Each structure stands twice: as structure tokens, then as C-alpha cells.
Amino acid sequence: MKLAIIVNITRDKALELACELVAWLDERSIDYVFDRQSAKAIGSGKWEEKADLNQHCDAFVSLGGDGTLLLASHYSRSKPVLGINVGDLGFLTEFSPDEMWTAMEHLVSGNYSKHTRSQLEATLESEEPMTALNDVIIEKGTATRRLPAFVIRLDDEILGSYRADGIVIATSTGSTAYSLSAGGPIIAPKSNVFVITPICPHMLTVRPIVISDDKTIKVSVDSQSGEFPLKMDGIQKKLLAPGEVVTVKKSPHHVNLVANQKRSYCEILRKKLLWSHEHPTGQ
């Protein structure tokens, strides 16, 4: 087995864990490689470009928060991703640093369970598809005279057109990310749905809508001028022109996250969102 290791190099704890992991792997003669930035940060000569990691590795280890895991997922292409949480919240990174070694034992032995998560695929005319595990976001950008109108179609039928600061199209996995901050619902991660969530809409009647994930969503921005950022999992990919159409649908490719069998989704919600903070469970 060969592991690809991606590290949040801005966090000292992640760098410390990376060095400990290297020693652990070396002791067991397990092959590994870092991406270029991670290798440079810890002084390792074993690295490859991120785009090449999937071709040469059997599994990915993410040391950081959800953002680091999202980065790893873009390159994993359905190969298992083990997320160790050294971030702040961590909905996706299921293992704590204390749980890392047991999780690593299970990973290298093949004795692990996984969560298979759907992704979004966004395309522009005559361009290659882009994928996102959490969400596709289109923002108002440089349209300054008045809020732009976002025109949304489902399977080529108009759903609506409304003025807002932007729009989030999220998977069930991504429902606890930007969509939640914008007022969207929490959706159980294995639900076969997407949620379309407006960002600060001009009208109070504009609300998030949950749709089946077999729908094709088309979004364009009705504005006389401006450029509108298109982001995939928070990373800007394009600046859209007025009227340019983004087609969003379920990707044929999945992400496989190594599961923590000691934690249920209900427990994750309780702990991350402090749902039992005011009234502890059982009291």
C-alpha cells in the first residue's frame, strides 16, 4: 500500500502529526508520499504533484480540518480518504488526533468502513466539468449598481428568478457548510437530494428548496454588467459573464470517506452544534 498525505501546513499540530505519522509508517515499511507543499513544510523529499497522487497511491490521509479533507477529496477520485481533525469544527474529518493510530491500523489492514458521498458536477459551455463534494456557489461579484438576478432552471423549466447576494447549490454532505450559514436545512448525508439556498435574498418569500439529486440545475445571472465568481467547495474557479449558464448535476464520481464507527451522525450534530449544551442528554 502507498499513502498520499495532505497536510494543513498553517497548523502546527498538523505538522507535528505529519512527522509522527512518517515515523509510524517508516517503522512498518509502508510507502507514502506528500504533496509538494506539505513535503516542503516538514522537510521531506518524498512528494508528488497533487494531480499525480491518485495515479500512484491507494488511499489518502488528510491532516487538518474540513478544508484540507475537501482538498484531498478533489484528487482522491473515489479512493478512500481518512480525515484527522486538527481544525475547529470538523463535520467531515471524523477522527481526532488521539484516534489516528487506531484508524491508521484499520486503513493499512483494509479493515475499515467508509461513507460514500455524492458530488456535484458543474460545467460551462465547451469546458471540462468541475466537481465539488460540498457545494457550488455563484456570488454577486462586481455588480454594484443593483443586486443581480439569479435565474434558476430545473430540467429546463424555470424554477424562479430572484435578486440576492448569491446562490449555493449543496449536496447533503455540504448542507452543514455555507448553505447552513445562509439559512439552509441540515440534511442527513446519505439523502439523495440537493439543496438550493439563496444568499441574502431581496425578498423574504425566497427560501431554500430541497430537490431530488437526479435533477439538472441551470443557473445564469441576469445583469447588464459585472463578473460573478463561480466557486467549487469555496475555491474560485471562474468569473462568469452576465447570461453565462452554469449546468449543475450529480457527478458520476463519488468520494469515499473512511468512517469512524464509534460516532453516529446524531452524535456529530450534538457535539458540533452544541445541541445538548444547554440541556445535557438524559437530564
From Swiss-Prot:
GO cellular component, as recorded: cytoplasm
One Pfam entry name: NAD_kinase_C
Main location: cytoplasm
Keywords in alphabetical order: ATP-binding, Cytoplasm, Kinase, NAD, NADP, Nucleotide-binding, Transferase
Protein EC: 2.7.1.23
Enzyme class name: transferase
UniProt record, GO biological process: NAD metabolic process; NADP biosynthetic process
InterPro entries assigned: ATP-NAD_kinase_N (IPR017438), ATP-NAD_kinase_PpnK-typ_C (IPR017437), NAD/diacylglycerol_kinase_sf (IPR016064), NADK (IPR002504)
Molecular functions per Gene Ontology: ATP binding; metal ion binding; NAD binding; NAD+ kinase activity
Catalyzed reaction equations: NAD(+) + ATP = ADP + NADP(+) + H(+)
Residues forming the catalytic site: D66
Residues annotated to bind NAD(+): D66, G67, N134, D135, R145, R163, D165, T176, A177, Y178, S179, L180, S181
Known cofactor(s): a divalent metal cation
Localization per record: Cytoplasm
Domain of life (superkingdom): Bacteria
Function: Involved in the regulation of the intracellular balance of NAD and NADP, and is a key enzyme in the biosynthesis of NADP. Catalyzes specifically the phosphorylation on 2'-hydroxyl of the adenosine moiety of NAD to yield NADP.
Protein family: Belongs to the NAD kinase family.
Protein name as catalogued: NAD kinase
Organism: Chlorobaculum parvum (strain DSM 263 / NCIMB 8327)
